[in-house]
Amino acid sequence: MNSLSLPHRYPFLFIDGVTDSEPGKHAAAYKLISENDWFITDTQTEMPFSLVIEALAQTAAFTGITDENSLGLLSSVKKAEKLGEAVPGDRLDLTFEVTRNRRGFVFGHAKASVGEQPVAEAEIGIYIEK
């Protein structure tokens, strides 16, 4: 993963690796959910939905990054839907497909899944700062 592409560091970096990225088209990444993650507690046994959406936004940023000086910033989340859960031991797969690219804004459809089980979907907008 190109760590220069995201300003996030532990504990707010929610992707462990980028598996595919084509600027202007799509990106794919993953997060390995562990019992050691700070958000897993005795009462919180799954990755919170808001953090799944953040992981999707971090994945989406890679569709607009063209060089090490580019920075992707979350600008919008619409139609966010929780469809399942990601618990310790799961690999959360994250994908983002670009639907529009306009004046520095990248919009698209994001999906999170564990295996074949969907976890979340959302329409996400990212602003790319150069």
Swiss-Prot record:
It comes from the Bacteria. Pfam families: FabA (PF07977). InterPro entries: FabA_FabZ, HotDog_dom_sf. Belongs to the thioester dehydratase family. FabZ subfamily. This is Uncharacterized protein YcsD. The lineage of its organism: Bacteria, Bacillati, Bacillota, Bacilli, Bacillales.
